[in-house]
């Protein structure tokens, strides 16, 4: 199986302008125009992936990073963006400032973006299935696994799952083809582990995101923990770096608990780690 991180595609030179226009749009109508530009690019991405994988499972995580990560910080690029969008430079700068976050890892990212801007995940789901339809017509068997990130409350997953399935089914219906697909979630928040029995009722699979789960369980920032983890290991506080070796007592126990809870209500749920 291959695991695909969609956000990487968004940073590519041919699409970052449309991504930025989409993020900085003030209305849903403007966002949809930008998303229409991105749709054929995303379809092409997935066609290539499906063709290379030749029928093997492909797990695709929908957009996860905070939106501000895609925005420019240098004046020259901001001015070019303002010109292309026909907006005052100061207005663009204000919008960029408004999108900045003090703690982005715990902020407006993952499924939270889909709750506030559902059209983004709609576009991505449509791109995945249109690509699947295209390669199916070419004789390549595909069964995409669509993964919704950062779920901590079952109602988040239920809301977005319904959105994704509706988008997918409408697209399939237009083509009159049968495409096998599944919709699941990444388990990376401790609360998701503790309520896995609820979440599993709305998921075809779980993928445990051990990096973020480790960060949120220990309360360590992966980017900053290097400043003290060496001392922790030297002094015997920790035996190993928890970002290199899975912590079995804490993080592992949460995964074990989530596995047990999920299997009790959904015996056929597929479980994995990424």
Segments (PLM) and residue ranges:
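Conserved alpha/beta-domain cores
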Residues: 1-274
């Amino acid at each position: 199986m291959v695991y695909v991180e969609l956000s990487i595609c968004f940073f590519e030179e041919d699409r970052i302008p449309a991504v930025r226009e989409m993020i900085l749009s003030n209305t849903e109508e403007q966002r949809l125009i930008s998303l229409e530009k991105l749709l054929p690019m995303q379809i092409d991405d997935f066609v290539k992936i499906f063709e290379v994988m030749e029928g093997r499972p492909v797990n695709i995580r929908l957009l996860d990073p905070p939106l501000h990560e895609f925005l420019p910080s240098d004046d020259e690029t901001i001015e070019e963006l303002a010109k292309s969008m026909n907006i005052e430079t100061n207005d663009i700068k204000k919008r960029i400032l408004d999108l900045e976050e003090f703690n982005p890892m715990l902020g407006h990212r993952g499924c939270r973006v889909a709750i506030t801007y559902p059209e983004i995940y709609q576009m991505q789901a449509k791109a995945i299935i249109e690509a699947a339809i295209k390669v199916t017509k070419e004789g390549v068997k595909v069964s995409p696994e669509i993964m919704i990130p950062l779920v901590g409350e079952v109602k988040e997953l239920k809301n977005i799952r319904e959105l994704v399935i509706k988008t997918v089914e409408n697209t399939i219906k237009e083509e009159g083809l049968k495409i096998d697909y599944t919709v699941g979630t990444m388990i990376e928040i401790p609360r998701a582990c503790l309520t896995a029995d609820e979440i599993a009722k709305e998921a075809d699979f779980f993928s445990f995101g051990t990096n973020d789960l480790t960060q949120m369980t220990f309360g360590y920032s992966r980017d900053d923990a290097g400043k003290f983890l060496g001392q922790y290991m030297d002094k015997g506080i920790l035996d190993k770096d928890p970002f290199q070796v899975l912590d079995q007592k804490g993080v592992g126990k949460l995964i074990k608990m989530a596995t047990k809870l999920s299997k009790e209500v959904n015996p056929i749920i597929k479980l994995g780690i990424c």
